[in-house]
């Protein structure tokens, strides 16, 4: 993923591996802290977080009956670890398929004594790839999808970045590949580049 992000001129100082939360015991430690504070209980072989106490209609499973944590527990453990590092503000990026998850994560952070107001949550909607006027049907289960690298290979890094920035994170984006490759006013990037070139030409003439 680092190489892909670099192509878009997005650079990260640090990458974090979720597996380390299991290896260093952070997840077990977080769960034990929940138990010590009386925030969880066992039922039907699973561990439940008392999210009703935080305004939800029902409690939420943190550990399945199989012993496997749900998304929420590692996410909470990661948030605790990051908040302990002393950052004043940070940004969470969630996909729309996890829109029901992040409120529980914030509740977990609050219940452990941290201020969730430091966390700015961005929820990104899905992107629909359109080609030849038709949506490209994607399915990760069927391994039928277009990668970001493939998209950049076809339309270029600058165009890809611009198209994604045209929409707010919570707005669904239809990425029209044909429009992105067109050298006309139908392509907003081409139009912008043309306007920039014209402005530069005017500035050069003024300087003369």
Question: Predicted segment positions?
Answer:
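Alpha-helical recognition segments enriched in aromatics with Gly/Pro capping
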Residues: 2-206
């Amino acid at each position: 993923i680092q190489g892909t992000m670099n192509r878009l001129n997005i650079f990260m100082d640090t990458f974090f591996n979720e597996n380390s939360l299991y290896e260093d015991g952070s997840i077990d430690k977080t769960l034990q802290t929940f138990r010590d504070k009386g925030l969880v209980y066992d039922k039907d072989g699973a561990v439940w977080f008392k999210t009703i106490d935080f305004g939800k209609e029902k409690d939420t499973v943190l550990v399945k009956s199989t012993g496997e944590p749900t998304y929420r527990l590692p996410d909470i453990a990661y948030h605790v670890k990051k908040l302990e590092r002393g950052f004043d503000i940070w940004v969470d990026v969630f996909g729309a398929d996890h829109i029901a998850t992040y409120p529980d994560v914030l509740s977990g952070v609050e219940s452990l004594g941290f201020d969730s107001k430091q966390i700015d949550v961005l929820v990104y909607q899905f992107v629909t790839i359109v080609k030849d006027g038709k949506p490209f049907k994607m399915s990760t289960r069927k391994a039928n999808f277009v990668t970001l690298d493939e998209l950049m290979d076809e339309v270029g890094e600058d165009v890809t970045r611009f198209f994604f920035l045209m929409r707010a994170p919570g707005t669904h984006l239809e990425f029209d590949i044909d429009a992105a490759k067109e050298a006309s006013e139908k392509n907003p990037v081409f139009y912008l580049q043309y306007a920039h070139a014209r402005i530069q030409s005017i500035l050069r003439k003024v300087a003369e």
